[in-house]
Amino acid sequence: MKPTNYHLFDFMDFDVDLSKNESLWKAYKPTSVCEKGGDVHVVVPFQKQVLANDMAADVATPKEEYTLILRQYSNNIIRLFCGFGEYEMTDNSEMLQFSERIQQLPLHVKAEDGGWTILSADGVRRAYINVKAPVLDHWSDLLPEPQETLDVVLYPDGKKEVRLAAYDHFSPPRYDALPLAYCVKDGNKERATLSFECKADECFAGTGERFTKMDLSGHTFFLKNQDGQGVNNRRTYKNIPFYLSSRMYGTFYHTCAHSKLSLADVSTRSVEFLSDQAMIDAFVIAGDSMEEILRGYRDLTGYPSMPPLWSFGIWMSRMTYFSADEVQEICDRMRAEHYPCDVIHLDTGWFRTDWLCEWKFNDERFPDPEGFIHGLKDKGYRVSLWQLPYVAEEAEQIDEARANDYIAPLTKQQDSEGSNFSALDYAGTIDFTYPKATEWYKGLLKQLLDMGVVCIKTDFGENIHMDAKYKGMKPELLNNLYALLYQKAAYEVTKDVTGDGIVWARAAWAGCQRYPLHWGGDSCSSWDGLAGSLKGGLHFGLSGFAFWSHDVPGFHTLPNFMNSVVDDKVYMRWTQFGVFSSHMRYHGTNKREPWHYPAIASMIKKWWKLRYYLLPYLVEQSQKATQSGYAVLRALIFAHPADKVCWHIDDEYYFGDDFLVAPVMNSDDCRDIYLPEGNWVNFFTGEHFKGGQWLYGVKVPLEEMPVYVREGACIPVYPEDVDCTDEMDLSKVTHLCIDDSFKGVWK
């Protein structure tokens, strides 16, 4: 359908010809406000609309009343809930995991002339509900009077004002946003919308792994997980129904329904949310820092757990290793040539047939998998395995899975997409809404973990079979939530068997941050693939996630997806980015081992050793991230939300508290660098710089990277070369002091 540039069609999803049996119901001003169980209940009438290109009240149809509930948590979070029909407010949700900091604060109502003020017990104003008539200087009857509206101002922390978009219209019939409304189709309530005012200069970030510029204003996002098929488009593996505002608040929409989020786009003066569920459940979180807001989000949805030490070492993989002998040869060479490495990952080739996931080793190419795994462990390597949450028609488990409904029964045959990269090419999706199916899946993984495998790559999970009957919910609601249920199952059984909670996951939704870690999907081995990956990682860190990785040096090649050669400079610059990432894994469609790039192999080894040198710092910063709102990779706005320049920088980042990293993402070995406030020291040259300035046209030799460390920082480091983390004795950790005596890390 071609865009119309009208809210009713482009955002609210009504057909242009209005041929369907659909109606829109708009919120009017409240009729009563009262206290109930510590909450405030606001009775709101909704008026059906006569729809054309415009909207007008259908006065022949009686209004319907619904209750808008306001609930205050702690000192900076206010919750708005309005269920249309059968929906009720609940904390019983896979997405929610309240911390002990989430305490409900009773709210009180103070009636005033023209409205109600909502106060917490300490007398702090938390909301104001306005029903005063607008001030008019009446001189014309040319246009109809505007309809009533819902005018509510929220003060989540008692200071910051977040207002519903009560008056976002042109003439009275021409609306660009609605404060609160719902839709009815064929007699069923189907969609709901909530809108907040935004300011002309307001900026936004977050919403998941978003492969676009830092400031998201002027964009509308469809929050539906799907295979991103790269990192340079609007698709994404990881949608998170949460955004951050430069006005120092964030909003978490508690839903797993397919949704739209317009950030000053459909209307440039509103943030608009549309859910395919006839319910609004929004948590508005205010704070004095980005970290405080994100900590509030984690207080609601859960904190990341701490990955094991070995996971911070280097992972080596490709798509794919096909035999134990091949893996042994590669691992032995890395040890002989002292390329430090901790994890060897087996992708799609360890099964009976490539890509045919049966959760069993090929008994010809891996004749003794347990001995193979333990032999690698003796050399300091852990083994990670690829798999996916679908069962193929040819898999040996298919009859058992069908007979017991471990895969959701299809309601109709779906067309294959003719690719290994699609859920539709499998016979069914494992039904994680069904406890017996979850336990069956855990049993498949347990057999592998009992052999000594330490990590399961929980690939895919963005797409499910939509024409299927799942035990616990409709596929339209399960689609986004599926990643959480899938990763939770793999994480739990891994932790139960090995003691270490970890997965290697691609998809995500709200709550998935509890089950680290996630990587950025199938990027192209190119400069734009590198740039898109970093953008996605920065927004992901602004969406509640602490840990994130990416395929070094990109996953696929161009023009030939599997067989084009990766450029040496791309390999080198992406390696540098990987060293300064929370986790570092080499992976892709062709060879990734450094000796296949002989011109730069010695430089690569030097950078790998730098990674292990910095592991104590990385572990320190990771522990901090699991107890706060911080990510390991942080966009500059994390620390400088008031610096308008930082809202437009998506190619630099903080690595923990003390490192400022500016990857080179071109073949010219040159870039501009913004130094935010503070005093900075070049990590490789020892040169000192004052912050708050641009460095233009900085030339960067291939063996170096623009990395700056805070003046006065004291960085914990490991002083000895090691081949893996098993060789580390953490009592030997020393500190690198960034003072006048520091002349560069390699000097």
PLM feature spans:
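Catalytic core of carbohydrate-active enzymes
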Residues: Y491-D496, D500-G501, A508-W519, G532, ...
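Aromatic- and carboxylate-enriched substrate-binding clefts and catalytic-loop regions
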Residues: G83-E86, M95, R174-Y175, A181-V184, ...
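Active-site-proximal structural scaffolding
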Residues: K63, R235-T236, L244, F273-S275, ...
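A conserved hydrophobic secondary-structure block that centers on an alpha-helix together
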Residues: G228, N232-N233, S317-F366
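Structural beta-strand/beta-sheet cores of well-ordered domains, especially the beta-sheet scaffolds
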Residues: Y66, G114, K238-I240, R247-Y249, ...
